UniProtKB/Swiss-Prot annotation:
Record-linked CDD domains: PIN_YqxD-like
Protein name: UPF0178 protein A1S_2615
Family in the record: Belongs to the UPF0178 family.
InterPro entries per UniProt: UPF0178
Cited Pfam families: DUF188
Ranges that cross the membrane: none
Coiled-coil ranges (or none): none
Organism, as annotated: Acinetobacter baumannii (strain ATCC 17978 / DSM 105126 / CIP 53.77 / LMG 1025 / NCDC KC755 / 5377)
Top-rank taxon, per record: Bacteria
PANTHER family per the UniProt record, alphabetical: UPF0178 PROTEIN YAII
Length: 155
């Protein structure tokens, strides 16, 4: 197995992306841990694990941050979690394929705070559209590129 792990913030992960993650685990012999506050319906194996945490805001996020190591990869759409992952030396990937960086995560945090302010004022902001086949391909490509980059870095 590789010297780094793939952590999945599974509470909000679109189900369409699970197969991409499981295929990557097989292809690269990569350990994957799905973390959620509910059963995610993943069959455990040698490389695939599921970790159920207590219900509550940010419980899964905190568990990931506490358990992850430098160079680990985390899949999340949670901006504060992505910021913590980067701060701890990991790599965070959005389910639509964007790899978070120190610069873009700060911009995303500001935008998130602004949208929270709008929602607090009663403005309906709507949510993101469902994951498309194009998003799935972009996520798969970003995940493969990130795994290969980490393989070279940790070799």
């Amino acid at each position: 197995m590789l010297p780094f792990k793939l952590w999945v913030d599974a509470d909000a992960l679109p189900k369409i992306l699970r197969e991409v993650i499981l295929r990557a685990s097989d292809r690269y012999q990569l350990e994957v841990i799905f973390v959620a506050n509910q059963n995610v319906g993943i069959t455990p194996s040698v490389r695939i694990k599921s970790l159920q945490v207590l219900s509550g805001a940010d419980q899964a996020d905190q568990e990931i941050v506490n358990r992850m190591s430098e160079n680990d990869i985390v899949i999340t759409q949670d901006i504060p979690l992505a910021a913590q992952v980067i701060e701890k030396g990991g790599i965070a990937i959005h389910p639509r394929g964007e790899v978070y960086t120190t610069a873009n995560v700060k911009a995303r945090l500001h935008l998130r705070d602004f949208m929270d302010t709008l929602r607090g004022a009663g403005v309906q902001t709507g949510g993101p559209p469902p994951i498309s086949e194009r998003d799935k391909r972009e996520f798969s490509s970003a995940l493969d590129q990130t795994i290969l980059k980490q393989k070279r870095k940790t070799a």
